[in-house]
């Protein structure tokens, strides 16, 4: 078996140590390690993290391969330091059967760049009317444990209750896209001062908050797990905080873009800033950062949403919603959370690896960097600063809101079970 010696890495941001990989596992962590014939990677004080886990990725295959494929999406994931991603169900056909989730899972196995765990749809066709084959998807080769109609809300309270009851049997989780559809008809951006000035249809915070309030109460009533996708408002934070104080089994995520960007950017009418849920206010951004720091929000998830050029290069009203994020997520988290002192690197590992792996039951991921553990690792040059150039993305799509923006940090190496998928910033 091949061996790799990572020399002088700051494990979770601590003091420099050596990490020896033997085959698929970490053999040793310490100082002055040596191994005959090992490939040596001089970390020179770079930060070593467990491989990142994304609980919310859109890989688009099957059906929208013009936006992304499992292969290109997992290459983007490896470039961003991810070793495991959860693929949302809003594909064509929808991932609402054992056959479709197994197809996505097998495509991930074949890619070799990143493990792919499919997310199953809650309802047939994402139509919100009838439960999908939750049990069959769980029992399939893909072993689905997370279910979501993301892109749409499970708006019917009876359907949501039944889904929570069903997944409780195997400790699954329903990941809710919190958006009350009647309150967001014709919505184009956050409802507030900017939407009023621009004359664009407003997307009120209560459309998100009302669904979260309902669903945490349903989860309490059923005694099941619920996960809230992409929190975007200060009010949503308060509801989740209240629910956790009652002992309700709720977890929540925030995207990197909601930690950094505000609705003021929509004044440019650049559709790259059009996203669901919409960019909110500075007050919301600060509340989300604080909630991620204090643990009210459990994890960072990218909501990587690739779109072809023609779906974004058009007038605002006609543009698709969504941003790519796998290749910039860690840099945005460093800028908003680490460089501001809100989180240390151990906190980043917790929010971007340990906890998402736990929520999604991702076996072998989100593990400590210690002897005997799977060698799923990410090496980060935290001292680096550079401009984002989407021309260099591994993703098939380029719809990033950060083009030309200077961000800190760069992933230099990623290892998936001991195999280097990224070396010196280049995919293998």
Curated annotation (Swiss-Prot):
Q: Which GO terms describe its molecular function?
A: allantoinase activity; dihydroorotase activity; zinc ion binding
CC cofactor note: Binds 2 Zn(2+) ions per subunit.
Q: EC?
A: 3.5.2.3
Active-site residues per Swiss-Prot or TrEMBL entry: 303
This chain's function reads: Catalyzes the reversible cyclization of carbamoyl aspartate to dihydroorotate.
Q: Keywords of this protein's UniProt record, alphabetized?
A: Hydrolase, Metal-binding, Pyrimidine biosynthesis, Zinc
Q: Which residues bind substrate?
A: 58-60, 90, 276, 307
Q: By what name is this protein known?
A: Dihydroorotase
Annotated Zn(2+) 2 binding lies at 150, 177, 230
Q: Which organism is it from?
A: Streptomyces coelicolor (strain ATCC BAA-471 / A3(2) / M145)
Quick one: which pathway? Pyrimidine metabolism; UMP biosynthesis via de novo pathway; (S)-dihydroorotate from bicarbonate: step 3/3
């Amino acid at each position: 078996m091949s061996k790799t010696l990572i020399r002088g890495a700051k494990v979770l941001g601590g003091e420099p140590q050596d990490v020896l990989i033997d085959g698929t596992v970490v053999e040793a962590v310490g100082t002055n390690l040596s191994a005959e014939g090992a490939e040596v990677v001089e970390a020179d004080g770079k930060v070593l993290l467990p491989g990142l886990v994304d609980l919310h990725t859109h890989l688009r295959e099957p059906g929208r391969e013009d936006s992304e494929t499992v292969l290109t999406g997992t290459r983007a994931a490896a470039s961003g330091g991810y070793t495991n991603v959860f693929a949302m169900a809003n594909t064509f056909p929808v991932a609402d059967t054992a056959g479709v989730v197994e197809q996505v899972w097998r495509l991930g196995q074949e890619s070799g760049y990143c493990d792919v765990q499919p997310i199953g749809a809650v309802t047939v066709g994402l139509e919100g009317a009838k439960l999908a084959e939750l049990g069959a998807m769980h029992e399939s080769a893909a072993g689905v444990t997370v279910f979501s109609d993301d892109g749409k809300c499970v708006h019917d309270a009876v359907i949501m209750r039944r889904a929570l009851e069903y997944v409780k049997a195997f400790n699954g989780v329903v990941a809710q896209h919190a958006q009350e559809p009647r309150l967001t008809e014709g919505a184009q951006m956050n409802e507030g001062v900017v939407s009023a000035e621009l004359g664009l249809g407003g997307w009120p915070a209560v459309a998100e908050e009302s669904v979260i309030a309902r669903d945490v109460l349903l989860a309490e009533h059923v005694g099941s797990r619920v996960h809230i996708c992409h929190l975007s408002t200060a009010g949503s934070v308060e509801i989740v905080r209240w629910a956790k104080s009652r002992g309700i089994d709720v977890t929540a995520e925030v995207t990197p873009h909601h930690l950094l960007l505000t609705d003021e950017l929509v004044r440019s009418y650049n559709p790259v800033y059009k996203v669901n849920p919409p960019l909110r206010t500075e007050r919301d951004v600060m509340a989300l950062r604080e909630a991620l720091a204090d643990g009210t929000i459990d994890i960072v998830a990218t909501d990587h949403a690739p779109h072809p050029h023609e779906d974004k290069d058009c007038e605002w009203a006609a543009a698709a919603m969504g941003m790519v994020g796998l290749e910039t997520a860690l840099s945005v988290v460093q800028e908003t959370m680490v460089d501001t002192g809100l989180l240390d690197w151990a906190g980043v590992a917790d929010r971007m690896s340990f906890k998402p792996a736990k929520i999604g039951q991702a076996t072998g991921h989100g593990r400590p960097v210690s002897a005997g553990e799977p060698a799923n690792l990410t090496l980060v040059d935290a001292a680096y600063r550079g401009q984002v150039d989407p021309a260099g993305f591994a993703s098939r799509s380029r719809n990033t809101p950060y083009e030309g923006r200077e961000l800190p940090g760069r992933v230099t190496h990623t290892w998936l079970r001991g195999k280097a998928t990224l070396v010196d910033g280049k995919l293998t």
